């Protein structure tokens, strides 16, 4: 499966000057919503991701995603795995579990995102689950932006990765783009302004 080509065909592989949810800048941005707007394609991708997870014999009960970007990917993965799905969301900048969702003591979760960059939002969701007595046994994403180590792709972990080293991350593909601190961004030096295409409200 050529994930890069799928993103390009869907108009989801963007080039420009982007402000990421981390506050860093990049010349490229992956807009997974453009991929996931097609239910058949979303189902196909998450069916493939479910097969990868199953091949590692990971035992889990439910899937949780951080809103907003992870919801479609997480829901489709839950369908493919025949598991329960819940999501966390930010309230005044703080990740919470709302809407009557519950976590049972000892319930095992995979946290699913559309894109994992450093893994910050996924880690926030994992901490919520663990604080309520659940157990996170792994992470999943359609795509990894190259910082976190992916179990099935054998890519190395980089310095900025936030996901725990002892838990696996599964993804369909890796995208490695240069990411810059705002104060040393070569795109800013050329006089262009970073735009924020993402979903996190900050």
Swiss-Prot record:
It holds the Pfam family Pribosyltran. Pathway: Pyrimidine metabolism; UMP biosynthesis via de novo pathway; UMP from orotate: step 1/2. It comes from the Bacteria. SUPFAM superfamilies: PRTase-like. Its EC number is 2.4.2.10. One of its GO terms (molecular function) is orotate phosphoribosyltransferase activity. It catalyses: orotidine 5'-phosphate + diphosphate = orotate + 5-phospho-alpha-D-ribose 1-diphosphate. Keywords: Glycosyltransferase, Magnesium, Pyrimidine biosynthesis, Transferase. GO terms for biological process: 'de novo' UMP biosynthetic process; pyrimidine nucleobase biosynthetic process. Its cofactor is Mg(2+). Orotate binds at residues 117, 145. 5-phospho-alpha-D-ribose 1-diphosphate binds at residues 113-121. Catalyzes the transfer of a ribosyl phosphate group from 5-phosphoribose 1-diphosphate to orotate, leading to the formation of orotidine monophosphate (OMP). Homodimer. Belongs to the purine/pyrimidine phosphoribosyltransferase family. PyrE subfamily. This is Orotate phosphoribosyltransferase. It comes from Campylobacter lari (strain RM2100 / D67 / ATCC BAA-1060). The lineage of its organism: Bacteria, Pseudomonadati, Campylobacterota, Epsilonproteobacteria, Campylobacterales.
């Amino acid at each position: 499966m050529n994930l890069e080509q799928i993103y390009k065909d869907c108009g989801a592989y963007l080039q420009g000057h982007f402000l990421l949810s981390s506050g860093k800048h990049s010349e490229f941005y992956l807009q997974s919503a453009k991929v996931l707007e097609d239910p058949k394609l979303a189902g196909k991708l998450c069916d493939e991701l479910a097969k990868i997870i199953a091949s590692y014999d990971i035992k889990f009960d439910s899937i949780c995603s951080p809103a907003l970007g992870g919801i479609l990917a997480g829901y489709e993965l839950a369908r493919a795995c025949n598991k329960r799905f819940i999501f966390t969301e930010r309230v005044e900048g703080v990740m919470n579990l709302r809407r009557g969702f519950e976590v049972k003591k000892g319930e095992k979760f995979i946290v699913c995102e559309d894109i994992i960059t450093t893994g910050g939002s996924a880690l926030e969701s994992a901490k919520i689950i663990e604080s309520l007595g659940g157990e996170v046994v792994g992470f999943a994403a359609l795509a990894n932006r190259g910082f976190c180590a992916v179990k099935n792709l054998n890519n190395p972990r980089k310095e900025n990765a936030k996901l725990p080293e002892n838990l696996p991350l599964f993804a369909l593909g890796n995208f490695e783009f240069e990411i810059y601190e705002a104060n040393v961004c070569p795109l800013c030096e050329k006089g262009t302004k970073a735009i924020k295409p993402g979903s996190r409200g900050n």
